[in-house]
Amino acid sequence: MQDSSSALESYSDVTLIGAGIMSGTLGAFLTELAPEKSLAIFEKLSAVGLESSNEWNNAGTGHSALCELNYTEQKANGEVSVERAVKICEDFQLSLQLWSYLVETGRIQAPREFIHRIPHISFVQGEQNAQFLQKRYQSLAQSHLFEGMQFSRDHQQLAQWMPLMMQNRDSNETLAASYIQYGTDVNFGELTRKLFDYLVKQKAELNLNHTVKNIQRLANGEWKLTVVDQQGQKRVHRSKFVFIGGGGGALPLLQKSGITDGKNVGGFPVSGLFMVCNNPEVIAKHNAKVYGKAKLGAPPMSVPHLDTRFIEGKQSLLFGPFAGFTLKFLKQGSVLDLPTSVTPTNFCSVTKAGIKNLPLAHYLMKQAMLTKAQRMADLREFVPDAKDEDWDVVVAGQRVQVIKGGEMRFGTEVIRAEDGSLAALLGASPGASTSVKAMLDVLVSCFAAELPQWQAKLTQMLPSYGKALRNEPQLYAQIKQRVDQVLALAN
């Protein structure tokens, strides 16, 4: 993709800030639903999808709640609540439907380059955790969305599902796992690149190496963006609608916009590390996404997982994440990001959340100081035979947890202007996997007047639009069959 030439002043109906999966998804929606709208994208880096959307910067799981235990909460009475898992599964189905539509209509090609079928497994150790996992399985198995899920404590069965992890295990160790065959691995970096290739072909203006420095509301209701390119040349860009999808960089721009709902919002950055396997023989022995259970007192982002990934055209194996303490909101950000994000309007909320989350800060600092030997010890809970020389450390992307009302939130959140002329996406997990649902929320809240005329097209693109798939077993079966065929997941 080449950088677009730009005048000192410019205009577009729609402006997307940040060239990641969220902006790419919203751009695809608007290109399909309102092709008459002009579209401009500003990205501060030299290519699209280099920050949180990049395949080396996220877990790439295709978060559909098939194996992530932090989406199913155990209540005080011992029951397991699966409502959030069902909701995330429904949301991920929307993502699969949009990608299928884009492939089916030739907007993007070669789905095998960004999505693969891979089993999803939940893995726990100890009797108490085994009982929790069994209750989770029993609750989820009642839904057709999780049809085919299996549960076992039997070591021989577990060895069939995850042979690498079961080598040289103590036969008396209490283990349990749930297994579901139709999980996915999604390379969101590759998908992001495909989405922006499509947008550029549809005459979207892609401006790389362009940093948005300021956002101001004009008297006529439009937004004025002050943009600086790599050579330091300043540009003024006006737009009717602005979406801030710059990952961790979204918060400072949201604050500069001055919209009411953005004034009390803060952010807390968390960095991440993964161990990546460099031994092809070891990589070949594992073919699954295996998610464990966070240790007592550890935050949700610390859930350990051993992931088969498909990156740069080959199978890879990653373990993590190991969290870390940072002041940066972006991997290529500044140590001033966090301090300068604290303003008079959010100071009380950020301070309150900071006091409440001192244990989290302590945990992150401890994680940041772990040696490779300590990280290998964590890995050996999953892979007892893991050898130091087979594993290297890679630095993953940044996530910025939303702080609102004195509370730290562990999800994604859309914040918008009252008139719907500006929206920003903040937060993290499940993130990219539910990007389609997140951008649908933007369409509904920001383009309400146009939504009625888009209904038929939206239903064509997303057959489950407006429906709860948990209550539609027949529709779900039809959608799954189509998705598997179009995205080459059936074999």
From Swiss-Prot:
<keyword id="KW-0274">FAD</keyword>
<dbReference type="InterPro" id="IPR006231">
    <property type="entry name" value="MQO"/>
</dbReference>
<keyword id="KW-0560">Oxidoreductase</keyword>
<keyword id="KW-0816">Tricarboxylic acid cycle</keyword>
<dbReference type="GO" id="GO:0006099">
    <property type="term" value="P:tricarboxylic acid cycle"/>
</dbReference>
<keyword id="KW-0285">Flavoprotein</keyword>
<dbReference type="InterPro" id="IPR036188">
    <property type="entry name" value="FAD/NAD-bd_sf"/>
</dbReference>
<dbReference type="GO" id="GO:0008924">
    <property type="term" value="F:L-malate dehydrogenase (quinone) activity"/>
</dbReference>
<comment type="pathway">
    <text>Carbohydrate metabolism; tricarboxylic acid cycle; oxaloacetate from (S)-malate (quinone route): step 1/1.</text>
</comment>
<dbReference type="Pfam" id="PF06039">
    <property type="entry name" value="Mqo"/>
</dbReference>
<comment type="similarity">
    <text>Belongs to the MQO family.</text>
</comment>
<dbReference type="GO" id="GO:0047545">
    <property type="term" value="F:2-hydroxyglutarate dehydrogenase activity"/>
</dbReference>
<protein>
    <recommendedName>
        <fullName>Probable malate:quinone oxidoreductase</fullName>
        <ecNumber>1.1.5.4</ecNumber>
    </recommendedName>
</protein>
